[in-house]
Amino acid sequence: MVIEQAELADVLVLTPQPFRDERGVFTRTFDADELDAHLGVPGVAAGFVQDFQSRSVQGVVRGLHGRSRRSEAKLVRCARGCVYDVLVDIRPDSPTFGAHEAFLLDDNDFRHLYIPPGFLHGFQAVSDVADVCFRTDRPHDPREGLAVAYDDPQLGIAWPAPVTVVSADDRAAGSWSDLLAALAVTAPRPVAGQES
């Protein structure tokens, strides 16, 4: 598995090395020892406690979601189809605070992301159907959820396809400015993100 640092501080891009032959493809999608060795902290990967999977049709946007109290780390991959996956750094002490980065994740190269605590996450399905798998290090608790509007002009995320469906909760999400106020921080306008 190849593990690389993303542009956003502390985010890792994990690319498995699949074995392909006439039968198809076989790959290892998770290795706790490799992830811990790269992070330099034993036991991080063993702390993942729940797996989730979503299915979305083309154009659906989910997010931007985070945790308000106890932040969570995530492993995210696309198990079917292709998604445009976006992260926003909401850690006030981070050198990339307020920045976002986008990644194309698909079921061909099996690339996935390690997202440390302190990020908003969202994605858009760009294939006809897309299944996204999440592994988290904290049990889900809807009382801890926070959200920022996927189309917040201060973040300026350029979703690659027309947005077809957004949940009522995501449509009602607050702004980047609302989040800054809730976090009791002041910051310059977020820097524009980029695609990896």
Ranges and model annotations:
Residues 1-108, 129, 136-196:
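Non-catalytic, conserved peripheral segments adjacent to functional cores
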